[in-house]
Design a protein with these regions (language model features):
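Short beta-strand scaffold segments in enzyme catalytic cores
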Residues: 19-22, 279, 300-301
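Active-site SXXK
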Residues: 26, 52-77, 172-177, 245, ...
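Short, well-ordered beta-strand elements
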Residues: 30-32, 64, 299-317
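Short, surface-exposed loop or secondary-structure junction motifs
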Residues: 31, 91-294, 298
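Catalytic tyrosine of NAD(P)H-dependent dehydrogenase/reductases that use a Tyr as the general acid/base
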Residues: 51-54, 162-164
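Short, glycine/proline-biased beta-turn/loop segments that scaffold the active-site neighborhood
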Residues: 75-90, 195-196
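Short, gly/Ser/Thr-rich active-site loops of penicillin-recognizing serine hydrolases
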Residues: 282, 318-337
């Protein structure tokens, strides 16, 4: 029997501003929620609140590429130069390597964070990301990123190892739009959100019902608003609710939408680091992915052996130490199931 008491107790202990659910193949087994989606409007954060997923969005970008591969619209082992000749190292890299974070392409967010940190030395990473990503919401912004990446060598030889880089999935999202002649949001809606009845899920952080906040200022008890933004890149722009993410978790557990071969590819971890939108969880035997954009945080852990998924959304960081402690206790709880 799943220890739902222990699950609730850990969440009560840390009082995260957000909500979390435990899901099996058919039902939401348990949920917990606390705090505000919007402090100014006094709107509580619930399992129906839409919030930014950040890099958890990469699962959908990866699966979109896999759908197009199955349909013969692209090839995973084709060189990136086939789809993005403007990138100077594109002839050395394949889409498969990008999906596995094994391309060596530097992380554009790290490059831009370093630049903005000198302009805003007292700002948190959450706050710094706002002006960076706000400037990248259209084709001109994407081309600026490619121009920036063209100024830097690869971090390592392709397929040498796996190292996390948002650039891979920003570019993959762009390739989807180029091949399909659809916006990424329309493609996701047609192939994922509508078939799974994920009616509260959209591409574009501007659609989040929850506002995003920096760490709570405990000196005066006031919140520091970061905002929703309007980011739409393939590396981290989906917004969703826990009710909809339960449907996504169940689709993964049932292996819907993709072919059996495509699911096998997506879930295979390479270089002991990354699958295609999946990583090894802190809990042995589980898979996971997290996400962070502006003040939004997301955590997704799933076990095929247990046929369970745990998903959490926050719109304000409890602070790095509290977040790590909560993650560690939750990982230990999952391991004991």
């Amino acid at each position: 029997m799943t220890d739902l008491t222990g699950y609730q107790a850990i969440n009560e202990k840390y009082q995260l501003n957000g909500a979390t659910i435990l899901v099996d193949r058919q039902h939401i087994l348990s949920h917990w929620q606390s705090g505000m989606a919007d402090f100014n409007k006094r709107q509580p954060f619930t399992i129906h609140t839409t919030s930014g997923l950040g890099s958890l969005s990469k699962q959908l970008t990866a699966d979109s590429i896999l759908l197009l591969n199955t349909a013969g619209k692209l090839r995973l082992d084709a060189p990136l130069a086939t789809y993005l000749p403007a990138y100077r190292y594109a002839d050395q890299i394949t889409l498969r390597q990008m999906l596995h974070m094994a391309s060596g392409i530097p992380d554009y967010t790290e490059l831009l964070l370093a630049e903005y940190a000198t302009k805003m030395p007292d700002a948190s990473e959450s706050r710094l990301s706002y002006p960076i990503l706000e400037g990248l919401h259209d084709e001109d912004g994407f081309q600026q990123v490619i121009a920036l990446l063209n100024q830097h060598p690869l971090d390592f030889s392709p397929d040498e190892k796996g190292v996390y880089s948002n650039s891979n999935y920003l570019i993959l999202g762009h390739i989807i739009t180029q091949i399909t002649k659809m916006s990424l949001g329309d493609f996701l809606n047609q192939h994922f959100f509508k078939p799974l009845a994920m009616t509260q899920t959209h591409l574009g952080t501007q659609y989040a019902a929850a506002n995003s906040y920096d760490d709570l200022d405990f000196t005066n008890g006031r919140t520091k608003v970061i905002g929703r933004g309007a980011y739409q890149g393939g590396d981290g722009a989906v917004v969703s609710s826990l009710v909809d993410l339960a449907k996504w978790a169940q689709a993964v557990l049932h292996q819907k939408i993709l072919s059996t071969t495509a699911w096998r590819e997506a879930l295979t971890i390479t270089h002991d680091f990354y699958g295609m939108g999946w990583m090894q969880s802190q809990t042995p035997g589980w898979l996971s992915h997290g996400g962070h954009i502006f003040g939004y945080w997301a955590y997704f852990d799933l076990s095929f052996d247990k046929q369970l998924a745990q998903i959490t959304l926050n719109n304000m960081s409890p602070g790095a130490e509290a977040r790590k402690a909560w993650q560690a206790e939750m990982a230990a709880w999952r391991a004991a199931l």
